[in-house]
Structures are given as C-alpha cells and as structure tokens.
Amino acid sequence: RRQELGKPDFDTFGMAAYIICRDTEEKVQAELQRITTMNPESKAYAGYKDFVGKSQLNVKVSKEDYCVSNRGLRPNLIGTPKQIAKRILAYEEVGLNLLILQFSPQLEEMKIFAEKVMPLVEQLRKEKVEAAK
C-alpha cells in the first residue's frame, strides 16, 4: 500500500512482547499462571472486569492481555530458551526487525534472556545461513 502511494517501505517493523524464559515447559507454565492469576476479590480483578465491561474494543481482552501491558503475551515469546529463539527467528523470517521486550523482574529476567536466548538466536541464524549454502 505504501508503494501505491509512492512512499518508501518502512525501515523498521517491530512489536512488543513479554518474555517468560525458563529451563522447562513446566516452569514456564507455572510462571505464566503466577502472573495471570487474579484473586476475584482483589482490586486488580475488579479493575479488569470494569475495563472489559466498559471496553469498546472490537476484540476480546483476555485476562492474560490485561495482566501484561501491550498485550505482550500474544507474540508467544514464552518457553524454553530454544523455543523462544526459534520463535524470534520465525518473526524475523516474515520481516520483523525490532523487538521491544518486557521482563519482570526486569534486570534478572533480562540477564537470563541475554545469557540463554540471545546466544541461541545467533547460533540458529548461523546454522540457517550454513544450511542455505
């Protein structure tokens, strides 16, 4: 559509995503459950119900969407380091070149991502290039 209007393609195409990285799928699911569980008697749950009730969005806002800002769980960058690395590369293959990542607690989770996921992303990229030769 941009080309039809005589405009250049976007240089950057990105998305926001919340990362949950654990060594096992069981630990991933436990953390997901922890951050998306709301006590029905809590103010947070009341806020969610109020938001959903008053929302004029054309999409359903799930509890998971509400618990993590920017609907950060939708990109599904949760899993083991290898699962996340493969998903990142799959997004790259369709043109994504910017990730705005969310972590909590930020520093600790960023370290896990940097130490466990990023090296795998680089390794899998190299393997893909080698396989294409």
What are these regions (language model features)?
Residues T36, E115-M118:
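Short, electropositive alpha-helical surface patch
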